[in-house]
Design a protein with these regions (language model features):
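Sequence context surrounding c-type heme c attachment/ligation sites in exported
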Residues: 1-104
Length: 104
């Protein structure tokens, strides 16, 4: 959904990109709420809820604002930041096999 958001934004489909970003949020939030505490890479239990909150109030909020303003540069920057937080969370969980494509 991350790349779909970018693709829609790049083709000027701003309302659709905003809707896709909301689907992305829904998927992430659902995944975390279904199992908020998981084993981390080092064997320690990791509570993902604070990571979700940071994701929501940081790059996701910035993405929403950029899409609403139809600002391509700001949208790309927000998507890159959003992706980086996803990668960080996956790394904390030892899920380095889950690959997230680069944002172009």
């Amino acid at each position: 959904k991350l790349l779909e958001t970018r693709s829609l934004e790049q083709t000027g489909q701003w309302p659709e990109a905003l809707a896709m970003s909301e689907k992305l949020h829904g998927s992430v939030a659902k995944s975390i709420s279904s199992r908020p505490v998981r084993p981390g890479a080092g064997g320690v239990q990791v509570d993902l809820r604070p990571l979700l909150v940071a994701w929501e109030i940081g790059p996701f909020t910035e993405l929403q604002a950029a899409l609403k303003k139809q600002d391509s540069n700001r949208t790309k920057t927000a998507l890159i930041s959003l992706r980086q937080q996803c990668v960080t969370c996956h790394t904390v969980l030892g899920k380095t096999d889950i690959q997230l494509p680069e944002i172009q």
